[in-house]
Every structure is written in C-alpha cells, then in structure tokens.
Amino acid sequence: MSIRIIPQDQLEKSDKRTAEVIPPLLFPRLKNLYNRRAARLRELAENNPLGDYLRFAALIAHAQEVVLYDHPLEMDLTARIKAAAEQGKPPLDIHVLPRDGHWQKLLQSLIAELKPEMSGPALAVIENLEKASAQELETMASALFSADFSAVSSDKAPFIWAALSLYWAQMASLIPGKARAEYGEARQFCPVCGSIPVSSMVHIGSSQGLRYLHCNLCETEWHVVRVKCSNCEQTRDLHYWSLESEQAAIKAESCGDCGTYLKILYQEKDPNVEPVADDLASLVLDARMEQEGFARSSINPFLFPGEGE
C-alpha cells in the first residue's frame, strides 16, 4: 500500500473519494514543532547518560525554530505536484527535485545562530562548514540523500541535515494538493519526499490508535497499519521489545523476515513523546536490538552513521 498525492485540479475529476476515514498523510505543522522538540530534548536530557548530546541537539532544534521565522519560504508547488503525480513520484523527491540556494541560506543562518552556543570541536565543525564552498555543500547534501555516509563526516551531517530538513519541511507545509491511499509499493519511504522515517507513533486524539511513520527529512507523517513491518510489509514474524514493562511508551518492532526494526512511540502511554527526541534519547534500546541481531531501518537526523558503520 503506497500513498499518492493528488493535485487540487484533479480532485474533482477523480472518480474516487479522497476524504478517507483514515487520513493517509499528515503534513507538517511547523508552528512550535522545533520549539516542542527542543523542549522535549532538554527534558529527556535530565538523568540520561546521553544528556550532553541531547542538549546539543536541543540547541540545533531551537535554532531551526528561529531560522524558520527569519527565512520564510514562498513557493508555488502546483506544477511540481502535477508533474510528480503524472510520473508516480513523490512531489519533493530528494533524488529528483533540484535544490535552490534557499537551503544554503538556511544553513548559514543556523550556523550564525549556533556559533555563540558552541565551543570546542562542535564550534570547529560549524566554522569549517561556514567556510565551505557552495559546491562542497551541494556535494555533501547529495551524498546524504544517496546514503553515502562515508562521504560526510558524522559531526557535519547533523548541521547539513538540519538545513535540508528545514527547507524540505517548509516546502511540504506548502503543498496545496491532498493525499489518497492507493495500492502500490514502497510504503517504507515518505510519499512526499522519498526519505525514510525516524520512528513511528501511535496517536491519540482525532487519529486515536493509528500508527504514522514520521519522516526524518520533511516532517510529514504517513499512515501504516499496525502489526505490519514498516520496512518489508510482512506480518508473520513481528516482535515488540522494550527496556521497561509491556506498558512502555517506547518499543521496538522487529521483523524476522527482513531483520530490521523500527521504534514505535505510544502517545497513550506518554502524550509528550516526540518522534525525533524520544528516538534519540532511547539509544540503549537500539543497542539491545543490535545485540539481538536486528538492523535499524531508520535514521535519526541528529545521529548519522560514520564511515565504516
């Protein structure tokens, strides 16, 4: 089951209803998204062995909030959505969509916002990025989108991704089309940009009990039914792991068929869970899953694989 985005001018022509009982897509609501993430990271940093890194990630998230409002994006995506629908591709496909200079402007603004807060190695990293040429930055961005993580040091990647993510999230929030679920493949990829999830969340409220995967780039969420592997869509050999009780707010769903796992966050157990922050703060669970022989099917935007990983 994949999700296709239908342009506005095609909705009335469609012979299928698009107002499903279950919303297939939840486009990013950028107001307070980054502030909420930063606050959650700071909260989780208390009594966490990774506290220093969580506070570091909170600084980046807060900078994203500031830069978001300093550099709003105005763009008409109507033609892009129509062309992508005709090609059967995500409208903001990371492998196809040309990047303009806006994302590099966001990066430089993030660096300016973060420099007073950084010291030591972290300061050296962002000063190095500040001096990089536009082509060097584009090369690193392309490498990250191609999952060529050996080409970008793991200390630079979070800063570059923070700018790219902000750019893609701004675009995703402007999409004028609507979404509808249609049969197909590749449900493990974001239907808006083609990136991968950071984690999944079982919602409360209007989408009570529904699971949505959260994109690690454009912040869109897309529906995937529960008790199905989000990577290979098999249901035969799924298991759920937690470091606490069966009522834990964070679990890992493992699949014996493809050998991967993805974390599931339960708002019913903790309404404050946040897909990026809580994933990053629960790396002990990742270590346990690695011991059990499972590979992570997602990437956290604050933690990229290093060379050889």
Swiss-Prot record:
It is found in: Cytoplasm. Keywords: Cytoplasm. InterPro entries: FdhE-like_sf, FdhE_C, FdhE_central, FdhE_N, Formate_DH_accessory. One of its GO terms (cellular component) is cytosol. Its main location: cytoplasm. GO terms for molecular function: ferric iron binding. The keyword Cytoplasm applies. GO terms for biological process: protein maturation. The keyword Endoplasmic reticulum does not apply. Belongs to the FdhE family. Necessary for formate dehydrogenase activity. HAMAP family: FdeH (MF_00611). NCBIfam families: FdhE (TIGR01562), PRK03564.1 (NF002925). This is Protein FdhE homolog.
